């Protein structure tokens, strides 16, 4: 596996789960694997759980870790191609990526959707530039459309606690005061569709995910109107 950005990259899902359970039993079994290797974690957006768990996993593998918060302790980076560099961003991402690659062996990138251009978000412009220009294996710590680390962790948890061989898994969501990226539900749906679970997505009409992530899931619409939901929400 050269890069890890989606469920397809992981290969055989059962083998990946078996290895994950093996590592959970002995978290330091492969402590020599990362000796003299360096992970660089690059954050364009804030993180708590992903940052902590990924850094701890790298340390358990014996790796050195460099954490770089873009725009917070590092130069602001221009990410648009073809722009005139006369603004408040003194360096371009395409110049910075090869430099980053020189100082590490593996790169993790966290870069959310910007809600400015859906095509750019769904093309994973920033993540793909790291894959193309870093010269290093790259994994996603949440990108514009997917969050594979969280989805794999969700799958591991379901496997650990399921009561039947083929459990029913339901995904839904509730109103939020501000727009949120769809990376987490997109990714969760993609991973659930890679299993034989009875996977159901339910939500009010008009809140659909992109069909390529819905896949073979059964979609059910809540018959209660969105207005009714909001009215009920205010009484809680």
Go through each PLM region and give its residues:
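Conserved small/polar residues in nucleotide/adenosyl-binding loops
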Residues: 227-234
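Residue-level detector of anion-binding/catalytic polar loops
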Residues: 64-65, 71-72, 106, 137, ...
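Short, ordered loop/turn segments at secondary-structure junctions
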Residues: 70-73, 112-114, 143-144, 204-206
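Glycine-rich phosphate/diphosphate-binding loop of Rossmann-like nucleotide-binding domains
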Residues: 48-53, 159-225
